[in-house]
C-alpha cells in the first residue's frame, strides 16, 4: 500500500498528461502531492522530511510551469529533487561525518562501516546520475518521451539499482540460525 501511496502523484501525472496535456498534468501532480501529504499526516501523524521537500519542489516548479506556461520548469523538477537528495547524502558524509543512509536504514540491518560508506556513495552517485539523465531526456527528446521516461524509465532504473544494492548487501546478511540444529541434544523433544 505504501508503494502505491508513494507513486500516486506520478501515476496521476502520467494519466493526466496522456488525456489532457502537460499543464493539466502539472496541476494534477501538485494536487495529488498535497493530497498525499494530507493523507500521510492524517494516517500516520508524521511526514518524512524528504516528503516535505518533494512537496516544496513540486509546488515551486509546478507552479512556475503553470504561471509561465513553460513546461521547462516541470521537466527540471525530478533533477532538482534527485540532486537535493544526492546533495544531502554528500554534505552529510563530507561535512558532518554523518552517513544518512545508515541513519535511515541502520535499525533494519547490521553492516560494517565500509559497507555503509559504499551504500552512501553509491546512492549519492545514483541520484547525481538520475538528475543528469532526466535533464538529457527532458531536453533531447519530446515531452511525451520525457513523461514516459519519468514513469517507466525512472522507476525501472531505480528498481535495477535497488536490486543491485540488494545483491551487494546479500554478502553481509547473516544466515538465520535453525534452533533445532543448535539446541543441545537433551533439549530436543
Curated annotation (Swiss-Prot):
The keyword Transmembrane is assigned to this record: yes
UniProt keywords, alphabetically: Cell inner membrane, Cell membrane, Membrane, Transmembrane, Transmembrane helix
Record's subcellular location: Cell inner membrane
Segments crossing the lipid bilayer: 3-23, 47-67, 76-96, 121-141, 149-169
UniProt KW Ligase keyword: no
Membrane topology: Multi-pass membrane protein
Any GO CC annotation of this UniProt entry: plasma membrane
General function of this protein: Plays a role in cell envelope biogenesis, maintenance of cell envelope integrity and membrane homeostasis.
Entry's family note: Belongs to the YciB family.
HAMAP family with a match to the protein in the record: YciB
Protein name: Inner membrane-spanning protein YciB
Organism of derivation: Paracidovorax citrulli (strain AAC00-1) (Acidovorax citrulli)
Source lineage: Bacteria, Pseudomonadati, Pseudomonadota, Betaproteobacteria, Burkholderiales
